[in-house]
Structures are given as C-alpha cells and as structure tokens.
C-alpha cells in the first residue's frame, strides 16, 4: 500500500491518515508520504478526520480497513464528494474463529461497505463475491496488487539470512516457504500436511514458516504429530521479506480465501515458483503448469504432488520461476497498479460530476438461452474495450442471474420506473443483439422492445440497434409500427446479415446509417484449448477423440426428421470416426431431443453439460471437426473457431446468417439423411483451407463496425 501511495503522489496529492502511531506510519513518512496520525480513540479520530476533510480541498475520500470504513460511512453524509473503500479481504472471513468479533466488528464493517459510493476490489474474484452478496456491479472496480520491480535484490546469501534468524537448514536444502498469519482463513495446516507428504519423497525438503498468530501451538503440535519437526522452522514475524524470498525455493499459499495476496507477487519478483490454492485472484498470475501450480483448497494430497513435482525437477522450478517473473513484471508492477488506481479515481469523479454516462442494453437476456447470453458477453466485452470501467446496465428477465453471471448491473423488465431513471443517467441505449424485431414467437415481445427504444429516445439517449437481426414481421400493423418507431428514435442500425437489410428497406426504414456488420459473438475469442480439454475431461468426455458438434432444438416436425439425422450421424461415425456430441444451447428445452435421435443408434455419443460460459463453449466447439446446427449461435461458435459447419434452418435468421457466413444450409423441412451426409462431406472438404480462414476473417473484421458505431455515438 505504501508503494502505491508513493506512486500516486507523483501524479496527485494524496494524504494518509492513520489512527495509531506505528511502523506503518513511520515508514510512510520516510517515503515522503504526507501522513497524519489521529490517536485517542474512535470518537477523537472521527472528529479530527471530519475537520481535516472540511479544511482540505479533497476530491475523494478513500478508506482502507474496517475502522476507516466505519469512519467514512459516518462522515459521508456531511460531504458532497465520493467515498470509496478498498476491499482487501472477505469481511465474512476476516474474523473466522472469533464469533464475537465477527458479530461486532464484522457486522459494522459490512454495513460501512454498503454505505460507500464505490468499492475497489482486490481481484476479480473479490468483486464477484461482493456481487453475489448484493453489491451493485457498476459500483465495484477490480484492481490487483502490484510489486516494485525497481528494488535491488538483497545483498545477502541464504546462509547469512538463515544465520540471522537462527535457522540451521543444510546448505543443499530445497526450502518451501509460507508467509502468513496463523489463523483459520490462511489454513497453514494444509501446507504443513502437504509438505509432510512431499518430504517422504524427497529428503532434502525443508519448510520455513514466517508469521505468528493464534494457531501457532496447533501448527507446532501438527508438525510433531507428522514427525517433521526437525524439517520445519518457525521464523516468527519476518521484517526482511526480500531476504526471506531470496532464501526459499518454492513459495506456498494454502488460503481458503484471498483477494490477490502480496505473497504471490513478491515471490514472482524474486523469480520463485508458487504452489497455491485456487482461490481469489491467484489464478490471474499463477496459471497451472505455466507460471506455477494450483490445487483446490484443503487438498493437502494435491499440494504434496505439486511440491514434489517442483522439488524433484530443478529445471521445472527455474522455468516456472522465469515465467511468473515475466508475467508479473508485465502485468502486476507497482506502476500498473498505480495507473489502474488513478484511472478508478478519474472514473469516480467523472461519474459523480457528470449527469450522463454509460450504456443501457436491452435484449432477450435472462431467459436461459446460451446464445443470447453469449451476445451479452460479446457486447459488454466490446463496450469494455472502449472503457474497462464503463457503466453498463442490462434489462433482463432474470436480473439476479445476469448480475451474477456477467458481473453487470441489471434491472428486471417490468421495473419501468427504474428503467426510466437509468435512461436519464445514460448516454447510449443499445437494442440487441439478436432477433428482437420479429413477431413470430410473440407480438408482445416486439411491442416491448419497440417501447423501450421509444422510451430511451424520450429520455435523451442516443439509440443503436446493435448487430441485430430483423424479422420475420408477418402482421401489417407490426411492420408499420416497427418502421415508425425505428425512423423516429434510432440513430444507427448495425445488422448481422443481408436478409435483415432487405427487410428494413421493405418495411420502409429510412434511418440514414444502416450497416451490415455481423453478429457480435463472432469476435469472442473463447478460452484456451487447455481449459476446454480440461472441462471435457472432467465430465468424462475424452478431448482427443474426433467429434461432430450438434446444436439442435425442438421444433414442429422434429420427431419426423430425427431418423434422418440419426442415419447421417451413424454414417459420419462409421466413415469418418466422428462421435456425436450434443451441445444444448437452451438446456431446459434442448436436452430432451437427444433421446429420439440416439434411440437405436449404435454410434457412441456424448452430451455436453450445462456451462453458462460462452467463452468456454466457443473453446469446446473449436475442438470439433464438424458442427451441424439448427441453433444460430452454434453456427456462430463454429465460425469463431473456423470449424466447418452445416446449418439446418428452421427460421429465416438461420438462413440469412448461414448465407452471410458462407455456410451450407438445408431448410429443415428438406432434411434427408443423404442430403445431410453430402452437405457434411462438402463442409469437411473445406476444413483447414485458406478460403475458409479468409471468409471468416473478413466477416470478423466487418463485425467490428458494431462497436465502432457505438464508440462514435458515445462521443468517445
């Protein structure tokens, strides 16, 4: 924190208030940070802090820690400036094992956090934790602790440092180190157990424990019970952490909960590989097998395997140490943290002072359809490319699900008064993506979406129909109403396919800016192949087999066509070795159609479990050899991964998109086994060709006009 404050003072005036004189305040003064200490109890500190803010020309009050949070919460009503707090740890776990403290200090801290205008969360995982507990996503900013890479390495040998602390480990020891306070949430006992198992397989292993706390006696007793007392050294509180990290070979973290601990970045600065529990923001830096090793909390046997793998392979230790150093220097330096904090301050002040900012998105979200959720992921991600802290509010059928799944603020569709308030505060209203302007599934939904467009314009928003599809519009009244509303209210339209453009002209849309771009999902990158394979393997699906992905849906006449599809799948397995893998996009509706297709089929098949993770699903489809789909977004996922595809069109939107993507498409009523086989063979013959790659790249480039249009409408 002091390094961050020192860096901030190179750009802004930042004063530090402490409530007790201690080493922290002394160090701050030595670093040149303007520091005041208000001792004398809570009320004295509260009064002096209020006087300081009243007499100072401050733009923001930034609180760190439970006492500061409570002070800020009580003072907030007296000042017209934003109050923010940095959430370093889970307030529900801060007093784990201390029920009285949790009932008093813990509850007061919780209430104080709710009173803040904004919260800075140390890691995306901590931000997600607060979202799950009801905090407004648009008021939460993620940040990651940085480390100062400019500090020189300590001029001390391991032997000298061991002598200073009274440790007599042999010179050739492989030292595992853990630096943590001894309380339940840090779970140092798992490290002790994990080390004990590893020590049985490598006699050179030693464990150095730096820290103090209520669990010390328990930990010492555990070492004795495991018969490793002669291989463990308790160093107590360590002031020279540079010397500590220069003296260990493997850094250990076994916490049950973390944000983004300094222990992981300090070890990275020293070039030491880390073995850590998969909690909080740790996986942002520690990528399993690439920059360190991860295990699940409490799993001391997995920790044993990780420690042994590193202890028995010096080359691997050096490789992971170099990799984590490079990644930390690139992404987690003090300078990058300082820039991030300054950006948060700028955003907070702008929001506090400007009457309008951000975007409201309205679409078919919260219905449980993976395709629509992928659209929201894509649109939000593109908006974040303009400003990573952009205020985004989503109109959703299931606002709670949208908040938790996407990390975005959301309101229910029937909350009209709340929608009006949000529109008055926003610059841009996005209608889309997807096929919202159609009256096949429901006329009422069409009228709802047209009403929201009209409402947005009435309340001063610029309006964009974003990467959307148009039609079908079967009723004359709906066609007239759609054209009238769009012409009156919409500033720009970006369409996902040429058929939609034809319909806009047909119904009389005269908006000047109408572009054919593409579906926003096309530019989702997807997660890594390693993530996809790990997910498949964890659900009993061998990722190295060859698969044909099936994105089907129930539709009138499906039962009659299931035999044709079954015969084609049997052929693809017999002749091509392709195992059918069913991937339901709307799990509640699509999963049941697997049974009539597979009934009597001798080919093996697999069914993808529900994920609610569009980026993971794209990565999984990328592993496929072929995609056969009725669901539009199954075809789009395949296009993202440049996988050969066959469309089975039950709706003009599928035909239009398939034509735009250059994908072969069969009208659903015309599906026969032989036609499906012939079309699949033709698609497979294109696999890996330059033409396929060029076609998809062209369309992805065109799709980028969706966000460029939004950027211009936002005035960015």
Placement of each model-derived feature along the sequence:
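Short His-centered aromatic/hydrophobic patch
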Residues: 63-69, 87
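A conserved mid-protein helix/loop that constitutes part of the nucleotide-sugar donor-binding site
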Residues: 1-6, 174, 178-197, 207, ...
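Conserved acidic donor-binding segment of nucleotide-sugar-dependent glycosyltransferases
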Residues: 288-289, 293-300, 309-314, 665-671
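N-terminal strand-loop element at the rim of the active site
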Residues: 1-43, 126-129, 214, 392-406
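Short hydrophobic beta-strand element within catalytic cores of glycosyltransferases
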Residues: 17-18, 273-276, 286, 627-629, ...
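A short helix/loop element that forms part of the nucleotide-sugar donor recognition site in Leloir-type
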Residues: 153-169, 527-541
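Aromatic "clamp/platform" in nucleotide-sugar-dependent glycosyltransferases that forms part
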Residues: 237, 256
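Active-site anion-handling motifs in enzyme catalytic cores
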Residues: 350-716
